[in-house]
């Protein structure tokens, strides 16, 4: 069953209510979100191209997956659920950071989210859900950086915003994993 409600939060991530997902994006209400970055053993990031039929940002490239936890669902649980539903992958996920952003999308919707960002590593082959994802590819952080500078219009607004933090967090994640 598709998620229809999001958890509204304050700037400290304390729940303040529940709202229908589309309404929250129309009104620009701050709500909880999850963002997942999956890397392979070659240190390449798994990118997804959003399905054209998505209600916003269809056809654009983005991080491995992102979504919203359901009311009462923990963010880690939501991250695992959406990683499997969108990409057919299961792997350990590590919480890395949170960030709050407000982005006006081209179609008039507003992404006002407090996002919980997770990293994971797997060499499993994605089994994409065509309702969510039209394609995928692995690229190094340097390749993505170059591509984003050349053709930013090919990427989702939130990916462009969060990606700026990824190189430093990836280095910290790798250091922690090698201990």
Swiss-Prot record:
Mg(2+) binds at residues 66, 86. The active site is at residues 66, 113. InterPro entries: Idi_bact, IsopentenylPP_isomerase_typ1, NUDIX_hydrolase-like_dom_sf, NUDIX_hydrolase_dom. Binds 1 Mg(2+) ion per subunit. The magnesium ion binds only when substrate is bound. Binds 1 Mn(2+) ion per subunit. Disulfide bonds: none annotated. Pathway: Isoprenoid biosynthesis; dimethylallyl diphosphate biosynthesis; dimethylallyl diphosphate from isopentenyl diphosphate: step 1/1. It catalyses: isopentenyl diphosphate = dimethylallyl diphosphate. GO terms for cellular component: cytoplasm. It comes from the Bacteria. HAMAP family: Idi. Belongs to the IPP isomerase type 1 family. Catalyzes the 1,3-allylic rearrangement of the homoallylic substrate isopentenyl (IPP) to its highly electrophilic allylic isomer, dimethylallyl diphosphate (DMAPP). Homodimer. This is Isopentenyl-diphosphate Delta-isomerase. The gene is idi.
